[in-house]
């Protein structure tokens, strides 16, 4: 009869491909730098900043102040619609659950 002993769990050995991982980190870093630059430009435009770097980047991206204001207007409208939809959905769900009890 076999004596009981601790189980041996298989270990997973993984060798990361250094080229693939470095390429992934580089692409991710470039993406995050672009996102930070765009956020700086949008925030600078929304607070009506006259910093030279914000104006230069806005000219390089070919974006006007009115376009950014329109974009945030549309975004706020959609956020409001989604907020109202989810609020009514939650209220209806609570009402239906209370009625079933």
From Swiss-Prot:
It is found in: Cell membrane. It comes from the Bacteria. Keywords: Cell membrane, Membrane, Transmembrane, Transmembrane helix. InterPro entries: IcaD. It is a multi-pass membrane protein. Disruption phenotype: Loss of cell aggregation and PIA production. Necessary for the synthesis of poly-beta-1,6-N-acetyl-D-glucosamine (PNAG, also referred to as PIA), a biofilm adhesin polysaccharide. Is required for full IcaA N-acetylglucosaminyltransferase activity. This is Poly-beta-1,6-N-acetyl-D-glucosamine synthesis protein IcaD. It comes from Staphylococcus epidermidis (strain ATCC 35984 / DSM 28319 / BCRC 17069 / CCUG 31568 / BM 3577 / RP62A). The gene is icaD.
